[in-house]
Amino acid sequence: MFRLYRSIATVFVFLMFSVGAVTLGTVVNLIIELFVRNKDKKQQILRYLVKKSFQFIVRICSIFSVFKVKFRNIDLLEQKHGYVIISNHPTLADYLILYSRLNNSTTVMVADKLNRTFMRKIICNMGYVSNNVDAEKITTILSDSDNILIFPEGTRTRNSKYLKFHRGAVNFSIRNQMPIIPIFIKCSEPTFLSDKFFNWKAPETTPVFSISVGNVIDYRNLINTNDPTSIQIRKLNNYLEKLYNREIQSAEETVPPSQND
């Protein structure tokens, strides 16, 4: 019976998210475009509204047991500026949960396909960048105080037993001399929103997300900076893959009990 209740709650939350996304992407964005001319001001207003919307949805999901979230060291994200933030990407809910706790100076790298939807304009106004944009162009977009969030797998995790990273995140980190903040995400129900945008049928138990912010990684302490850049990138990427595979596997049996932080 409780599973049926959570399934109904999942449908409700999905509808609420969809209506909110359409409203923000069209009506709200249009109003802000009409009355706010300053580009930076427009960006900050939209980022604030999206963050607050996501915080509300995460709270509703917790109240109705759609999923629960356990954070560790998440407050560090709100205090950091000028970092490359990376994370594994096991489900479609990851971005929503993470963005609800990022500071407003964080730029997000989004899938290129989103730029071909009705969300294209609001994505542009929020200062987000496509994942097919080269590192040099991203550098011109970011200010010195900006963070950038990148999912180095390039898509959702397909094989949780061994994560494989693209080199875009480390390439950007090394070329712009920006330290890396790793985020490790583990979900107690691995199939929850892992391969579908929406699944009305709730898992037997309430999914619990364990989201942990790791220590800052300064690549200059890990690799020889006198090596050619391509070798530095390869070595740092290999290091991050090993780090994530070790951390994710060690978390297999340690997902915390259902609660929201």
Region annotations inferred by a language model:
Residues 29-51, 77-132:
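Catalytic core of membrane glycerolipid acyltransferases/transacylases, capturing the structured
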Residues 134-261:
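Non-catalytic C-terminal accessory region of glycerolipid acyltransferases
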